Amino acid sequence: MSSMETEKGAVPTPQAPPVAPTDNKYRVVDVILRVLLLAASIASVVLMVTSKQTEIIVSPFGSRPNAAKFQNSPAFIYLVAALSVAGLYSIITALVSLSYMRKPIVPPKLFWILLIHDVLLLGIVAAATGTAGGVGYIGLKGNTHVRWGKIRNVYDKFCRHVGASIIVSLFAAAVLVLLVFVNANSLYRRIPKY
């Protein structure tokens, strides 16, 4: 704009700060972490859903078969539901991230949306993992103060499946923590430096 236009009363319009291009390595790491989240979610759900074991229980009233399955515990059902949502979420967000891979500039709003949803899902998965871990620990060790006996010596296969599922879901929560760091860092790098 020339000085002549300014003198005639034309007010210069403020320009928005330039949007910094996103580093491609962050996009690749984001997609890889989302695929890892999908794999961990599927593996944990499969381990939990296949954790059924039937044993003959002897009691003073006779012996009968008794099945241990994940549906008997609300904590395990919550874990399966949370990880199913995490798996679906990882598919959707991986596709969104892949669609923005070829674009030179990614809108900051996308990073905000991903960051908020990643944090929300991290809370859900971490709560489900902790809840299932608490129930699993009582099944493993029992609680002598309230006379809850351990079940690991009777339902060993069931306990192994549940334990492996909880460990893999803990890995899924760690992947979500890394996704939060990656998206927060990507958003931070886009803040204009004055």
From Swiss-Prot:
Keyword Transmembrane helix: yes
Highest taxon in the source lineage: Eukaryota
Membrane topology: Multi-pass membrane protein
Stored Pfam families: CASP_dom (PF04535)
Subcellular location: Cell membrane
Residues exposed to the Extracellular side: 49-75, 131-161
NCBIfam families referenced in this protein's UniProt entry, alphabetically: A_tha_TIGR01569
Family statement: Belongs to the Casparian strip membrane proteins (CASP) family.
Subunit text: Homodimer and heterodimers.
Name of the molecule in the record: CASP-like protein Ni6
Species of the source: Beta vulgaris subsp. maritima (Sea beet)
Classification of source organism: Eukaryota, Viridiplantae, Streptophyta, Embryophyta, Tracheophyta
Gene coding for it: Ni6
